[in-house]
Amino acid sequence: MAVMDLSSPWALTKQDSACFHLRNAEEERMIAVFLTTWLQEPMTFKDVAVEFTQEEWMMLDSAQRSLYRDVMLENYRNLTSVEYQLYRLTVISPLDQEEIRNMKKRIPQAICPDQKIQPKTKESTVQKILWEEPSNAVKMIKLTMHNWSSTLREDWECHKIRKQHKIPGGHWRQMIYAPKKTVPQELFRDYHELEENSKLGSKLIFSQSIFTSKHCQKCYSEIGCLKHNSIINNYVKNSISEKLYESHECDTTLWHFQRNQTVQKEYTYSKHGMHFTHNMFPVPNNLHMAQNACECNKDETLCHQSSLKKQGQTHTEKKHECNQCGKAFKRISNLTLYKKSHMGEKQYECKECGKVFNDSSTLRRHVRTHTGEKPYECNQCGKAFSQKTSLKAHMRTHTGEKPYECNQCGKSFGTSSYLIVHKRIHTGEKLYECSECGKAFNTSSHLKVHKKIHTGENVYECSDCGKVFSGVSSLRMHIRTHTGEKPYECKECRKAFSVSSSLRRHVRIHTGEKPYECIQCGKAFSQSSSLIIHKRIHTERETL
C-alpha cells in the first residue's frame, strides 16, 4: 500500500512524483503480502494511516492537502478490493474538518451548545458529519475513529453472514438504521462513499450498516423489509440534508438522506408516532408480509405514502368516511361511488326503460327484469331466480329457516323485507296512500292492487255475485265461499279451511303457540286480533 513518510510539512512536495510513479508497483506488492498474512496477522486501518497535528496541518498548502487526501483514500480502496468488500471506516480529511469548523462558526451557539471543535491530534481523531433537522439547524455528530479497533478477521465473519443471507451491500446505501438510544461507537462500520458533496468539497462516506459481525444477522433479519436500490442517485449532486424519523413504540430511529433541503411534503401516522417527510421514500415490497419483516406493533420501517395508507387500514377497518353523512368505508373506491348518491349523479342508464343507476352491477340486475334471464336455479325444486339474494331467500322455504324474528310478537320470517312489513302491523304505520280515495296501505304492492279498482285495469269479477276484485288471488278465495272448497286441512284433527292463514291460526290450538305477547303485562295470545282486543283493557285503564 502507498504509505508515505509525512513527518514534516514539506515531505509531500519532495515525494509527489515518486509517490505517483511507484504507487502501482507498491500496491501490487502490498496486496500480495496482505493476501498471505491477513488471516494470521490482524490489521487495522491505523496500521497504515498517517495523521497530522493541527499545527502541522495548518502549514500545508492546498495541493499538499489534496495529495494527502488522495493517498489516504487510495489506501482504503486497496483494502476494500481484496477478496471481498471490507467494511470501510469514515475518512474526512483535516481539510474537510477545517471547512466544517468554518461552517460551524456561522451556527448560533444556542443550537448546539455542547458541540466543541476538538483539535485533531495523533491521540484523538474526531470525525464529524453534517446533518439538518426540519428547522434547517445544522448540528454535528461526532464519530471517533480511534474507537474502531475491529480486525479484518471480524470483518470476514460479518461478510460470511452477509453472503449467507444473500443481502447485497448496495441495497442499503440509502438508509442508516440505528437504535434510538446511544450506540457504542465501535458498532459503526461498513461505510460507503457518495458523490462529491458541494458543501464540504470532499467525498462524504455514510454508514451502510452499524453492526459488527455478531450483530449482522439480527440487523438483517429486523430490517430485511427495507431492501431497495433505486434511489441512490436521487439525492447526490445536491446539498445533502438528513432527516431524523422516529417510531416511538418500537424505540427505533431511521435516518433518510434526501437531496433537497426544503421539505416538500409531510406525512404523519399517529398510530405509531411515525413522521414522514418528502414523497420519495422507498416502498418495502414485503412490508408486514414476511415473518422476519417488521410487525405492526414494532414498526421499524420507513413507509412510502401508499404504504402508509395500507398500514393504516390494518388498524382501522373502515378508514374512509363520507363528510356529508359520516358513513365509513374500507376502500376509497366504495366511498367515491357512494358520494354519487349525495350528488344525484347516475351514470348507468337502462336502454329499455331509461331508468338510471349509480353502478353497473345494479344496472345488470335490472336488465334481467326485461330479458327474463334467471341464472340462479334452485337445485331442489328447479325454480330459477334473477338475483342470488332471491335464491337464498327461496332456499329457506325448503330448510324452514326463519332467521328474522319480530322482537314484539316473536314471529319469524325468511326474509328481512317480510319482517319490515310485519313490524308496520305493530306500529300501525301505513306509508302508501291512495291519491284517489285516501286509503292507506302498509305495502306498496297492496296499493298497486288497490289502484286497479279506480283505473279499471285488470279487474276480476265474480260470475256468481258480480263482486269485483283487483287481484286474481282475491277472486279465487272469494269463489271458495260459493263453492265451499276447503283445500287446507289440519293434520291433527282433519279440520279444513278455505285459506292458508286460517289453517295457521288453527294449528296453534294444537301446539299451544302464543306468539303475540302484551308488552305491558306479558300475557300472550295465539292470534294478533286477540292481542289487539286485550290492549284495549290497558288503554281504557289509562284514560280512567
Curated annotation (Swiss-Prot):
Q: Which PROSITE patterns match?
A: KRAB (PS50805), ZINC_FINGER_C2H2_1 (PS00028), ZINC_FINGER_C2H2_2 (PS50157)
Which SMART domains does the UniProt entry name for this protein?
KRAB, ZnF_C2H2
Which GO terms of type biological process are on file? Answer: regulation of transcription by RNA polymerase II
What this chain does, per the record? May be involved in transcriptional regulation.
Start and end residues, zinc fingers (C2H2-type): 320-342, 348-370, 376-398, 404-426, 432-454, 460-482, 488-510, 516-538
Instruction: Tell me its family.
Output: Belongs to the krueppel C2H2-type zinc-finger protein family.
PANTHER family given in the database record: ZINC FINGER PROTEIN, ZINC FINGER PROTEIN 564
Q: Which Pfam families match?
A: KRAB (PF01352), zf-C2H2 (PF00096), zf-C2H2_6 (PF13912), zf-H2C2_2 (PF13465)
Q: Which GO terms describe its cellular component?
A: nucleus
Tell me what this protein is called: Zinc finger protein 891
Q: Matching Gene3D superfamilies, A to Z?
A: 6.10.140.140, Classic Zinc Finger
**MF-aspect GO terms:** DNA-binding transcription factor activity, RNA polymerase II-specific; RNA polymerase II transcription regulatory region sequence-specific DNA binding; zinc ion binding
Query: Which chain positions lie within coiled-coil regions?
Result: none
Xref: CDD domains: KRAB_A-box
Keywords in alphabetical order: DNA-binding, Metal-binding, Nucleus, Repeat, Transcription, Transcription regulation, Zinc, Zinc-finger
Residues covered by the KRAB domain:
43-113
Subcellular location(s) per record: Nucleus
